[in-house]
């Protein structure tokens, strides 16, 4: 049986995540009281009507604070039943959350006459801290639209051909912010930039003219070899430590040329030695 626990601050995309999981065959429960998590796992195991026992639940700040504090204990009880439990935590920058609530005109569940929206968001962070600390996968939705979030959830949670650590190699541009859910970040902004070549500016690191240009640069080759050697040595250690998800982020200025080129090469090389390696270009 597989149980996915979805949590995160209000406005970060939990409802979208549940919709994606429901469309993928999961039995979904919104706003589950955290205290009944072990019983839910037990009941799902013995329910013979679940031909494909896949369950997803959301747990949010509307829970009793005492239950949220006990989340580590409750999760351990569920996992003791030999269930694959994945904790997905969604979040976004506070300014983005404020903007989303302003645009939708929805009420935050923790606001009241004496607590502003900004204060409610900060209180929510504290309440959900025990869940965030135990998240197997964190997705920062700050720069994601609805469709990108759906694709990200499918890529990270559902497209794992084999069990074991799921690795994501992701390119990004620093001008749009560094991905907060990255475990390892490599900055390649010191490399020659195709952007300053007029004939290459409109191409990306996926296009042959940019590939040929970067492949001919000695510094690019040195950087690639150093990053590759580091990852080939240490990523198997991450897998051996029972990490469920590892994100490797490669950043350049705009996320179109250098980081894309390096990410594509790294992805192909890592796929030769590791299982469950996926490649994503955040800013293309």
Curated annotation (Swiss-Prot):
Annotated residues for binding of ATP: 8-15
InterPro entries: P-loop_NTPase, RapZ-like, RapZ-like_N, RapZ_C
Gene3D superfamilies xrefs: P-loop containing nucleotide triphosphate hydrolases
Keyword Nucleotide-binding recorded: yes
Record keyword Transmembrane helix present: no
Binding sites annotated in the UniProt record for GTP: 60-63
Superkingdom per UniProt: Bacteria
Keyword annotations of the record: ATP-binding, GTP-binding, Nucleotide-binding
Gene Ontology terms for molecular function: ATP binding; GTP binding
Pfam families from the UniProt entry: PapZ_C, RapZ-like_N
Family: Belongs to the RapZ-like family.
Function: Displays ATPase and GTPase activities.
Protein name per its UniProtKB record: Nucleotide-binding protein in ptsO 5'region
Organism: Pseudomonas putida (Arthrobacter siderocapsulatus)
């Amino acid at each position: 049986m597989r149980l996915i626990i979805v949590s995160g601050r209000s406005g970060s995309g939990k409802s979208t995540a549940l919709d994606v999981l429901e469309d993928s065959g999961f039995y979904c429960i919104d706003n589950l009281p955290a205290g009944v998590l072990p019983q839910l796992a037990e009941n799902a195991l013995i329910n013979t009507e679940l031909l494909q026992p896949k369950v997803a639940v959301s747990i949010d700040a509307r829970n009793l604070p005492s239950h949220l504090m006990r989340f580590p204990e409750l999760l351990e009880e569920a996992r003791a039943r030999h269930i694959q439990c994945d904790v997905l935590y969604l979040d976004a920058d506070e300014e983005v959350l404020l903007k989303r609530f302003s645009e939708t005109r929805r009420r935050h569940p923790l606001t009241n006459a004496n607590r502003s929206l900004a204060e409610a968001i900060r209180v929510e962070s504290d309440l959900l801290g025990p869940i965030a600390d135990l998240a197997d996968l964190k997705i920062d939705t700050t720069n994601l639209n609805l469709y990108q979030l759906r694709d990200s959830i499918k890529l990270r949670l559902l497209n794992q051909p084999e069990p074991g650590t799921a690795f994501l190699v992701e390119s990004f541009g620093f001008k749009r912010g560094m991905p907060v859910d990255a475990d390892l970040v490599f900055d390649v902004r010191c490399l020659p930039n195709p952007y300053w070549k007029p004939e290459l500016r409109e191409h990306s690191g996926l296009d042959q003219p940019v590939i040929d240009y970067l492949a001919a640069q000695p510094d690019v080759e040195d950087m690639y070899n150093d990053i590759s050697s580091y990852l080939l040595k240490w990523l198997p250690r991450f897998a051996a430590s029972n990490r469920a998800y590892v994100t490797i982020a490669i950043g350049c200025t705009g996320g179109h040329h250098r980081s894309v080129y390096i990410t594509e090469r790294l992805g192909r090389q890592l796929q030769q030695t590791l299982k469950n390696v996926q490649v994503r270009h955040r800013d293309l």
